[in-house]
């Protein structure tokens, strides 16, 4: 096997933005593989009714698996790959710069990522782990005495420092654009996506950093911020966390919008339809996301007035999203020639997944329906369609775009990528589409057992996850030849 990717990681001390970007992608790949293997273990347990791998004495392991799966995939796979990898590699090029303004700060932000990852993963080996869920809701996170939760908190703080440094660097680079003949309104949607993501991170990260520190103080210094028996309020945690968490969904997928727009205009030999409206739609979505936080925890029953408000905000988010879908589909419809069929197939797969996830998101945006479906696997299917799979597809497209499949230096042929795309699509549909049907049953999430009559749908989901695993291993085999 070639070790070019590992060589690039060690040579990232050069401060070159492309090498740092590839190093980010390399880290994101291996972080993502660890998180994906955890999800395969979860699906293996759910393949049949009854407790098979997990026993009554080891139920905490199941809680630990889905907690770390969520944390790793959100903060160390998607954020590292899309914002760190694509942002560092592509952003200065799109602005006409040879590098970002502060290359050394860029390097420091890279070094914080593996530190945070090691802290989070090491929580597995500390006492009984930390099966709190990726949201770390109190009173569960404040009442458990094991030190694993503290390691998770500091690991997430390290990842937050990395994202903050990158955001400041990208915004400073954007405000320093002085290329001759370069007008702000002519900046590509891919560059704007990085800028908007940076602004969202700078607005939301201080809040979630504060709330994690408050949890730490509650655990060790009895500050009682979230302890209801001592004038604290656990709902306050949800308000503060989802001020970050709701924009975070858009933070993770926004660079994906930019790279899909860039690839469509590059490989279809067609200028992006509605380029300016695409930028305006991303900007409007970024702004509205900050005010729709209650959609993610409307089940605590705000009251009819606030429920109507958050339902309205969710519908407003869907409108510019529909505009982006229209622009992409129109660009594809008007193509005269295609340079890379494989890349175009992956972009079509991205659009299909996002349409499915967006449609189910409008359903969950209705407060009355969300009350019934919030704690079911319907939410799991929606979340993976609208965000996780789209983000992974964006990274795959970008890796093919820079002609370094999985950073080992292999050039993925058009025929091979055209074969991988439909297989990936089938595995995604098999894994997550049945969750919408079982969610209406309703099948609760975060539970390792279920009634026998739901065995068929869960087996199909496990089959799709197994197909994804085989596909990833096949790609590793190809690049090792």
UniProtKB/Swiss-Prot annotation:
Coiled-coil residue windows: none
Protein name per Swiss-Prot or TrEMBL: Cytochrome c oxidase subunit 1
Task: Describe the family membership recorded for this protein in Swiss-Prot or TrEMBL.
Answer: Belongs to the heme-copper respiratory oxidase family.
What is the scientific name of the source organism? Theileria parva (East coast fever infection agent)
Query: Quick check: keyword Cytoplasm in the entry?
Result: no
Q: Which residues bind Cu cation?
A: 246
This entry's Enzyme Commission designation comes to 7.1.1.9
List positions binding Ca(2+): 45, 50, 448
